[in-house]
Amino acid sequence: MPDIKITPLGAGQDVGRSCLLLSMGGKNIMLDCGMHMGYNDERRFPDFSYIVPEGPITSHIDCVIISHFHLDHCGALPYMSEIVGYTGPIYMTHPTKAIAPILLEDMRKVAVERKGESNFFTTQMIKDCMKKVIPVTLHQSMMVDTDLEIKAYYAGHVLGAAMFWIKVGSQSVVYTGDYNMTPDRHLGAAWIDKCRPDLLISESTYATTIRDSKRCRERDFLKKVHECVAKGGKVLIPVFALGRAQELCILLETYWERMNLKYPIYFALGLTEKANTYYKMFITWTNQKIRKTFVHRNMFDFKHIKPFDKAYIDNPGAMVVFATPGMLHAGLSLQIFKKWAPNENNMVIMPGYCVQGTVGNKILGGAKKVEFENRQVVEVKMAVEYMSFSAHADAKGIMQLIQNCEPKNVMLVHGEAGKMKFLRSKIKDEFNLETYMPANGETCVISTPVKIPVDASVSLLKAEARSYNAQPPDPKRRRLIHGVLVMKDNRIMLQNLTDALKEIGINRHVMRFTSKVKMDDSGPVIRTSERLKTLLEEKLAGWTVTMQENGSIAIESVEVKVEEDEKDPKQKNILISWTNQDEDIGAYILNVLQNMC
């Protein structure tokens, strides 16, 4: 049986640094190439030495697929292509290709220009890397080479996020990246057809979570923000540039308008303009409501939300600030946090998942003091709230996706080991599917049955259609088509018997077996035949006994014929013949006639 092999170089029983090596049918595909936001050393990048100990990896990888623009899925891409060395094709959607280089450049500035880190990619490397990108369109099959085919499906999550169906020969895998099975205020729900892959590789960030109702969550969020600013406090909402930021901005904008509130709301400078540009450019990726109203009213032209200037950090009075990045691991959001954390009137609301090692993860874990690299210690007196507006599938959504695409095996990545184990047992109970959860560096081998795709002849399909119309089958059971497999000129065709024999130039021959029984009867042959037919009908109740034009009697393929005995006119010869398929019937009828005679 052919094998599918998967080795996580990142996101194996872990969140962050998503990077999987998929091998099947002699092809090696890299799925995502992210960086870990919780590390500032070599651990931030996937360990590419698993592919080749040193040197370029081009000859070992057939293609790279990037699911979306979040840095934990694409942050190591320039490092991999320009420093490690990869010149092959990189596939991603059009929005991902447009947005990823901006986020990569922002990250590079923070790491190199502010923190002074070395062994990092340059601006030119980002540009050179993006030249290797081949953009893909949703639901469009793309041939990487003669054997490797990929297709992108809508994943929700963020603008341009896609799940990928990957096929080599008869084997297929679906890689979800990050996805959301619930529509929100600006994006639709993830969707995939019933593709029945050999393996579904699914994220499992919220493997044990069933989210409360969206309306309750939004009401709680608005209540906490309003209460904090009403008493003069400041609210920090760390977000990533595109995605939850737009979702929460729309929510607050609508609430401020309805309640006629005047407290200032700020968004990190430049990001609102960028968001507007990309949502206009890729409007087809948003949900139906935004697509319908965009011409008349741009949902992202905010009346109450203004660009933020760093000088506002020390301004007195209440305010709400959206700042990047979303995990408080660097940038403006971390600067604001350091200033506002010691004040108990202030609040930070974490709307998404924070990986281990980030400041966001530490304060969500209850840390009252946070120590930084320069030995600066910040006391955390401000209120810390976690409200999941994360655009990841919860446990219910993951189960729904499994039901939708009907995989033969499931693999969980991008999650915590304990939560994965719980979900694995749920999948086993509900779907009886083998579920894998390899750790980083661990190769998982999945055997798949041999499947050979064949063409079917038109005449065979027409015959099956007639049979289907005559007696529709049970829709829950797969319909089998029977025919003759003809292999000719590197083509395999399933045909009916007549066409198959004609195709390969063979005349059909039928072998018949004949036995003779003597019977005392001096009357005419036709009368003997009629009397014999009546006797056989009595003896063979349930069988169809017919008289042929040539005077012979037919029972299935068995033929009974009466002839004169040339030597004795008072006797008749009864000849019984049958094909090898009906040997049992022929032997039974022969026995009946022998007893009669």
UniProtKB/Swiss-Prot annotation:
Disruption phenotype: IntS11 knockout flies live for 5 or 6 days, show developmental delay and die as L2 larvae. IntS11 knockdown reduces viability of adult flies and results in locomotor defects. Zn(2+) 2 binds at residues 72-73, 178, 414. Changing residue 517 to M: Rescues lethality in Ints11 knocked-out larvae. Mutant adult flies have a shortened lifespan and locomotor defects. The keyword Membrane does not apply. GO terms for biological process: RNA polymerase II transcription initiation surveillance; snRNA 3'-end processing; snRNA processing. Belongs to the multiprotein complex Integrator, at least composed of IntS1, IntS2, IntS3, IntS4, omd/IntS5, IntS6, defl/IntS7, IntS8, IntS9, IntS10, IntS11, IntS12, asun/IntS13, IntS14 and IntS15. The core complex associates with protein phosphatase 2A subunits mts/PP2A and Pp2A-29B, to form the Integrator-PP2A (INTAC) complex. IntS11 is part of the RNA endonuclease subcomplex, composed of IntS4, IntS9, IntS11 and inositol hexakisphosphate (InsP6). This is Integrator complex subunit 11.
